[in-house]
Amino acid sequence: MSATDRWQAVVRVGAALAVGSLGLTARNAMTLRRPDPDAVPHPEPLVVLLPVRDEASNVVECLDAILAALDRWPGPGRVIVLDDESADDTAELAAGYAVRDARVEVIAGTPTPQGWLGKPWACAQLARHAETTAGILIFVDADVRVQPCAFAAGGALLRDTGLDLVSPYPRQRADTVAERLIQPLLQWSWMSTLPLRLAERTARPSMSVANGQLLVVDAGVYRRAGGHHAVRAEVIEDIALLRAVKAVGGRGGVTEGSQIAECRMYTGAVALRDGYRKSLWAAFGSSSAAVAVVGLLVVVHVVPAIAMVGGSRAGLVGYLAGVTSRAVVAATTHGRIWPDVAAHPISILAFGLLTADSMIARRRGTARWKGRTVAVGR
């Protein structure tokens, strides 16, 4: 077989896989669970848990949104804020809410113990401080803005489906070029690769998807699974928590959440690079797995685009399948469609560079976030 024949074979394989991925994306778009913004769940105690570290620019808007959502909760509800040794005005700003609103409690976090990472430790302290009578716990990140219907809709989804953990995926706000290239890959990555309804039921670790930006969990199952103590050394603690829930017989997974919450994870290219540098390596488990996944993505979503430029019809089919898959996800999650989806192959290449950067930082021990080295599990 000549080099040309081998190239054409790779193009055909990539295009076929892209078409198959598009089919799965369309299926998931039709079956993806969606919170009902008008839902009114059965009244039960709710505790919202908000870990914050150097979030002075976010905590005010975040708490305003949380309190508006608590107004719509039919049962008793409150929010506990844990200040995780902030060096800015985060604690003072949060304390002002506690003075004005009895539903807000602010506690000071203690230093991260050996063997723990910062966020799992903060969440574990919050959960320990929550009332044991709470029926539902909702973990929220400070860069998330929930809608007034968010907690009622999320709680109703949890109870009506019989699941033990639901992760309504917020709309991912992306403003700069770097954000627009990378952030849409978050929802696309699971909508294009996993059969989501099956993923809810199976205990296979590789089929667990969750997003710690907004997690709604049954309090009893959370404690039975070991809570964040069970995931204390995990960089990607949200997915690890879902796996812990499944390990004790629970069920759960990701749902659409763009109508009830929005999040801008990173503001610009530098923040985006630093954020993925500290965590992306943990998504693969090993360097060889990272190379395999990125290589497969290149074959499926970059090779066809290159071949298309050379006049390959198989390449055109593969490119259009990838772009259409992205468009379906964007339409489903209220993201930006055009012209962003046309740059899908470039997004994949940028993701590959971020993955390499993260793997190098992990190997060198230079992965850091908010002044802390991400070193557990190295």
Show which residues each predicted segment covers.
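Membrane-embedded multi-pass helical conduit in multi-pass membrane proteins
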Residues: A289-T366
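Acidic donor-binding/catalytic loop of UDP-sugar-dependent glycosyltransferases
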Residues: D89, V140-L157
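N-terminal membrane-anchoring/stem segments of glycan-assembly enzymes
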Residues: M1-H42, Q183-P184, S192-L196, A330, ...
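Cell-envelope/extracellular polymer assembly enzymes that use nucleotide-activated donors
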Residues: P45-V47, R78
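Catalytic donor/gating beta->alpha subdomain of glycosyltransferases that bind UDP-sugars
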Residues: L158, S167-W190, G220-R223, H228-A289, ...
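A conserved acidic beta->alpha catalytic loop
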Residues: D83-L93, T110-P111
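Short, acidic, metal-binding catalytic loop of nucleotide-sugar glycosyltransferases
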Residues: D64-P76
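Long helical/loop segments within the catalytic core of UDP-sugar-dependent glycosyltransferases
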Residues: N28, E105-A130, A153-V216, G220-R224, ...
